[in-house]
Amino acid sequence: MKRTPSTDSNSTSISNTRRTFLAATGLSALAAASKALAREYGPGAEPVRYPDPDIVVLDKRFEKYKIGNTPIQRLHTGMLWAEGPAWNGVGRYLVWSDIPNDAQLRWLEEDGHVSTMRRPAGNSNGNTFDWQGRQISCEHGNRRVVRYEHAGDVTVLADSFQGKPLNAPNDAVVHPEDGSIWFTDPGYGILLNYEGNKADLQLKEAVYRIDAKTGKLTKLTDEIFKPNGICFSPDYKRLYVADTGASHYADAPRNIKVWDIVEGTKLGKGREFASMTLDGFEKAGFADGIRADTDGNVWASAGWVGDGYDGVHIFAPDGERIGQIRLPEICSNVCFGGRKRNRLFMTGSQSLYAVYVEARGAHVS
């Protein structure tokens, strides 16, 4: 005799109850996951359980750089778009830009005090220091690269090329052997009045070099859509530049490029160093500011994708992604600082973050 399934009201009720329970369980799991992602960093936040789950090892080569008993810390918040962190080893402070607010801020290592260091600041973006301890800044608003002298006056290092104004210098590094300044000019600062003064680009986006002795400005390459973050390898034989051209060019890659440095002043042919595509995400984000450590790894700010992606991506010298530092905001730039240059400072949209790592910055920041 064939048995037919029961269709009485009790069975239906049990089935509905089970479905309701499973649905509720699923929602609870999603809520828990969302809560886990929505990490609190404010003064009243509970301390994170070690090891910090947002310092992620993707490859065993990153294990030695992750410290088990240190947290990612938010040092300050309240900016509109934080950028350009740079460490001053003599003054023991970090300077960074808040571009839309036209200000440079300073964080003191001794007590964590934050103050406005310079305002107006030319809508400055990237900052660094030369080997004489003088601050170099890339100004969106004035479309130039400047140096702040010890006496307080400002020296304009570059504001035009071949008779045309620069677009909006973005980030810069200083070469130790000859003091030359290498910088990127993607033009983001003139696209809107929000971060500078709106205007048309008169030059192709490019990477430049300023000769420290003569002041001569040389174009190194324009074989890149929108050159952004920039850094040298530890031996100064290679130059890395982040390409964020996909923000405005449909056929632009989302990657970091590398060039061999020829005769100390020129670049060979560029090639892809690392892709910003990450397994498990439908789209790739952007690398922005980048810095190298003494082992040749490249630490790249990353963002514009969302939770689990935004933060810092760490690439080994062969271009393989080996680790992540996840942040609750888009990360715009990074630098190494602190007494041992083993503290990674990260500007994350509206906030400043820091974390100790078992790596040391390769250069003056």
What are these regions (language model features)?
Residues 100, 141, 191-203, 248-254, ...:
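Short, solvent-exposed loop/turn segments at conserved positions within beta-propeller repeat blades
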